[in-house]
Amino acid sequence: MLPAYLSNPFAAVFGGGKPIDGGRTYKDGRRILGDGKTYRGLFSGIFCGFLAGCIEIWLSMRGFEIMGIKMPTFGPNYASALIVVLALPSGALFGDMFKSFFKRRMGLKRGASLPLVDQLDFVVGAWFFTYLAAPEWFVSNFTTGIALTVLIMTPLLHLTTNIIGYFIGVKKEPW
């Protein structure tokens, strides 16, 4: 999940510039996504998440462990692993954009809180893209126990990192 977890903060750090929706509005008169979703943020977030995944692949191939826990393999071979580590951050950011689209439809402005949805949108997106790209790998690695752990720990990690982002000036809201 690290490539997915890292994509959003790096999108925020390196983002800015032209909004993906080009300032256009939907048929309800509201912005499609808003100014917070930019091409630079999307591509930098995917790139940084992918790079983190490549580092994990490299460490895994060398038998690296943290406190006795082996690094994930991400696939049976290098090409398969690269597909997974590209799907995770891509799905995370598209999940975040999907959520933004629906928040705009609900009349919620950029930065408005939508509890649990704000914390889990990128997980759902990452899982969806990864399942589409590598279904066998997904099913064998995201067991019920792992999935529950991710769903419980992610809101806590998300809140912690957003508070840090708020205090260092990267985020305008601490959620």
UniProtKB/Swiss-Prot annotation:
UniProt keyword Cell membrane, yes or no: yes
Highest rank taxon of the organism: Archaea
Q: What is its main location?
A: membrane
Q: Which keywords does this chain's UniProt record carry? A: Cell membrane, Lipid biosynthesis, Lipid metabolism, Magnesium, Membrane, Phospholipid biosynthesis, Phospholipid metabolism, Transferase, Transmembrane, Transmembrane helix
Q: Which EC number(s) are documented for this chain? A: 2.7.7.67
Name the needed cofactors.
Mg(2+)
Residue intervals passing through the bilayer: 41-61, 78-98, 122-142, 150-170
Which BP terms does GO give this entry? Answer: glycerophospholipid biosynthetic process
- Pathway, per Swiss-Prot/TrEMBL? Membrane lipid metabolism; glycerophospholipid metabolism
One annotated GO molecular function? CDP-2,3-bis-(O-geranylgeranyl)-sn-glycerol synthase activity
Q: Is Membrane one of the keywords UniProt gives this record?
A: yes
Q: Which family does it belong to?
A: Belongs to the CDP-archaeol synthase family.
Full protein name: CDP-archaeol synthase
Q: What's the source species for this entry? A: Methanosarcina acetivorans (strain ATCC 35395 / DSM 2834 / JCM 12185 / C2A)
Lineage of the species this protein comes from: Archaea, Methanobacteriati, Methanobacteriota, Stenosarchaea group, Methanomicrobia
Name of the gene this protein is made from: carS
